[in-house]
Amino acid sequence: LAKKAGLKFERFHHISTAYVNRQLRKNEKRSFNNTYEQTKFEAELLFRQIENIPYTIYRPSIVSGNSVTGNLAASSIIYKFIILLSRNLLRKLPIDSDASLNIIPVNNFVNKMLAIGSKKESIGKTYHLTHQKNTEFRALLEQACSLLNVEPPEFVSRQQIEDIPNQIMQHIEVFMPYIRQSQKFEFQTEEGITNILPPCDNVISTLHNIIHNFSSSKK
């Protein structure tokens, strides 16, 4: 649309997601957890197909709140769980006990994205922006529950998902694929992809600030 309108721009910066780069088995078709991932990937394809469009694609893992201020978007996976935990509604969770998440604080992601985007050599390239290491989901939950002064939920098998009330599942179902798998993006390779592990603040300390900010806003 911008091109048809005759607008001049230096380049498009597309924020995709690292989850479009799932490792596939031989002869396995690319699949997506949801339409969010699918549309992010389709947008990537469009940028690569259109001629004379300068672009840079950024693929973050799970973006959390600001590690300094604790500000957190209401659409975040972390926010949804904090809400349920704070109300003592999440009593069971059907995930593996060793599940882990790759979380990057939004300020760390944005700072690195701006640094990459300021360089001409990043035009036409795709970058993975993820944390140096995953964080155990159990550790995150236990820390959150301790800060919120509530009992942590019980981890149950996936077969026991029917034990969770529908009104709770409807809030977390879309996030289940992410907390059921321990994706380590830094070990993935794909032609034309640059893996970047920017300096990131500690996820647990970030969680402290997020919950402190959340609790203060509810007073």
Where do the PLM segments sit?
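Glycine-rich Rossmann NAD(P)(H)-binding loop
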Residues: 65-67, 93-100, 127-135, 145
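Proline-glycine-enriched beta-turn/loop adjacent to the NAD(P) cofactor-binding site
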Residues: 18, 60-66
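Active-site Tyr-X1-5-Lys
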Residues: 22-25, 31-61
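Amphipathic terminal alpha-helices
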Residues: 176, 185-219
